[in-house]
């Protein structure tokens, strides 16, 4: 009897069955790889979306006093920079820094519905803020309109009592000028290095700007601390609806700076304690817990951990860090770190505490920072002084995280 050589024995798998099994196995492998790749892309894009950035030109610190910058606003409405400042280097995309976009965006939504009556030098519009808010300094500027030339003039003169944003106890302030709701076009002053009471005396012209459109705008000034190697830190902001200002002549204002719209409150808070032991020449920093941390991942959460840097005379001395708390916006750490600090070096010592969001597949994100020293912000200075006044006792305090 003839037997088909292709026929399989009853217990053995046929060629077709083996082929189908191989195809299924390969398909499952490809599917798993694609799912993993999609998850990685989704997480990475999610972080970028949460921290969407706009490109900004670097302020030129070499410009002279009293110089004018002009933006020509044609009837079509788009602003074009037509008058470069002498000595200013051209903007180069490769030499631009990034800044949070949310401050200006949030302000457009909140201010267009709140047109408050203002008078030059008046500060009554800020009374509702309460006297307990942090002092961010104040700024002096002038604004007026030339009807013959259809030009709005803004002069930024000076600022006083700005807070220190650098761990060296100073700031490098400059000012951005917007006419909201236009967020795309802006003008900037030069940077004043290491100066908490800067004088700019710079004049800015918005040319070809019909008066009926000017009164629909909000003059917005944002003071920032320039950082050459990272994002600039917002110091404070001021806004004035131009339909509430007499623009027939130059009006001069002194206005207190308010927290920027993307301010520190949205980043969360950190509870920590400091314990100073003068006989042992040491400070113990206890990172206790955080609350309401900013969500950095697309899933609406973060993987926070805390870095603690000991600085002496602007130089890094020692770093410690906590464990990472997965998917937690209200983590509890309870981790202590001891630092050796001789008494005679206390005055030049700064402790920088940074809350980070851990990311395995990309660079870790900064959620917020705290600078502790005798020359930091009011809340930080109070904690530092309380620590020294109560030796060998842990002194705990909540701190707002800052950009």
UniProtKB/Swiss-Prot annotation:
It is found in: Cell membrane; Presynaptic cell membrane; Cytoplasmic vesicle, Secretory vesicle, Synaptic vesicle membrane; Lysosome membrane. The keyword Metal-binding applies. Residues 1-16 are vesicular. Ca(2+) 3 binds at residues 227, 230, 233. The keyword rRNA-binding does not apply. The modification Phosphothreonine is found at residue 58. Homodimer. Can also form heterodimers with SYT6, SYT9 and SYT10. Interacts with calmodulin (CALM1, CALM2 or CALM3). Interacts with CD63; required for localization to lysosomes. Interacts with APP. This is Synaptotagmin-7.
